[in-house]
Amino acid sequence: MIATIRVVVTGAAGRMGREMTRGLLQTEDIAVVGAVDRREVGVDIGSLNGLPPAGVIIQEDLAGVIASARPEVMVDFTVAAAALANARLAVEQGVSPVIGTTGISLERLDELHQLCEARQVGAVVAPNFSLGAILMMHFAEEAARYFPRAEIIEIHHDQKIDAPSGTALKTAELMAARVNRPLTPSPAEEKVAGARGATYQGLAVHSVRLPGAVAHQEVIFGGQGQLLTIRHDTTSREAFLPGLLLAIKKVRQLKGVVYGLENLLEF
C-alpha cells in the first residue's frame, strides 16, 4: 500500500498555488488536507480548480489548519515575507516546508536553516521546480568554466513582482561558485542608466516582464569567435509539478534547509 503524504498549501488561491494544488489533488500518494490564502476564503479547493469538491476549504489561519489537519508538509507559493513567517510556524510544529516563493535573501535562509536544524526538521527552498530549468542551470554552471564572459536574460509574465527572478540569481550563484573566481561583465558606457541590466555575482542580468510569457531564461556565453546559448522555456505551469512532487517526497528525510532542487537530483 502506498503511503500518503499529508500536505497543506499556502498561497493556494494564487496562480502557482492553484496550478500546483490541482496537480496535487490528482496525485495518488498525496492528500491535500489544508489550503490557506486571504483570497477565496470558504471556497472548496477542488471546486476552485475545476475538480470535484475535495472537502477542503480555503482558510486564513495557518496555525489553525496545522492544528486541525495535521499535515506533514507545507507547500508555500506566497511572497517572501509571508513564506518565511509560514515556514517558521510550520517548523515549530514539526511540519516540513517546501517553498517555491522567490525573493528570500540568503541571510533569511540561513536563519530558517538554523531553526530547522534545532527542530530536526527538513525544508526545501527552490527558486524553480522545473526539472528542465534545473538542468539548464547545471549546464550553465559547467559552461562557465570554459567561457570568459556570460550574461543572463530572464523573461516572465507581467504579474511577477520580483526581478531578477530567483532562477536567474541562483544561476549566477552557481556559475560564480563553479569557476571560483570573480566574474566580470564586459565594460561599456551606459548612455541610458540601466541599459546593461543589473549586475549580480559579476554577471549582467536582464529582466523582461511581458504578458503572454510564463517563465523563460537564457544564458549567453561569449568566447573568442563563438557564442553559446543555453535556453529553457516553460510554456505551462504544469512543468513545475514533477519537481514539486520530488521535493515533497524527499523533504521529510532531510534535516535543515536544502536550497535548490538540483541538490535533490543526481548528476
UniProtKB/Swiss-Prot annotation:
* Gene Ontology MF terms: 4-hydroxy-tetrahydrodipicolinate reductase; NAD binding; NADP binding; oxidoreductase activity, acting on CH or CH2 groups, NAD or NADP as acceptor
Q: Which Pfam families match?
A: DapB_C (PF05173), DapB_N (PF01113)
Known catalytic reactions: (S)-2,3,4,5-tetrahydrodipicolinate + NAD(+) + H2O = (2S,4S)-4-hydroxy-2,3,4,5-tetrahydrodipicolinate + NADH + H(+); (S)-2,3,4,5-tetrahydrodipicolinate + NADP(+) + H2O = (2S,4S)-4-hydroxy-2,3,4,5-tetrahydrodipicolinate + NADPH + H(+)
Intracellular or extracellular location(s): Cytoplasm
Q: What is its main location?
A: cytoplasm
Record's keyword terms, sorted: Amino-acid biosynthesis, Cytoplasm, Diaminopimelate biosynthesis, Lysine biosynthesis, NAD, NADP, Oxidoreductase
Q: Does this entry carry the keyword Amino-acid biosynthesis?
A: yes
> What InterPro entries does the entry give?
DapB_C (IPR022663), DapB_N (IPR000846), DapB_N_CS (IPR022664), DHDPR_bac (IPR023940), NAD(P)-bd_dom_sf (IPR036291)
> Binding positions for (S)-2,3,4,5-tetrahydrodipicolinate?
157, 166-167
Residues recorded as binding NADP(+), renumbered to this chain, are 39
- E.C. number, please? 1.17.1.8
Gene3D superfamilies assigned to the protein according to its UniProt record, in alphabetical order: Dihydrodipicolinate Reductase, domain 2, NAD(P)-binding Rossmann-like Domain
Gene Ontology CC terms, in alphabetical order: cytosol
Question: Which residue positions are annotated as catalytic?
Answer: 156 (proton donor/acceptor), 160 (proton donor)
Give me any GO biological process, just one: lysine biosynthetic process via diaminopimelate
Pathway noted in the entry: Amino-acid biosynthesis; L-lysine biosynthesis via DAP pathway; (S)-tetrahydrodipicolinate from L-aspartate: step 4/4
Q: Where does NAD(+) bind?
A: 11-16, 100-102, 126-129
Q: Which family does this protein fall into?
A: Belongs to the DapB family.
Q: What does this protein do?
A: Catalyzes the conversion of 4-hydroxy-tetrahydrodipicolinate (HTPA) to tetrahydrodipicolinate.
Q: What is this protein called in UniProt?
A: 4-hydroxy-tetrahydrodipicolinate reductase
Native source organism of the sequence: Moorella thermoacetica (strain ATCC 39073 / JCM 9320)
The gene for this chain is: dapB
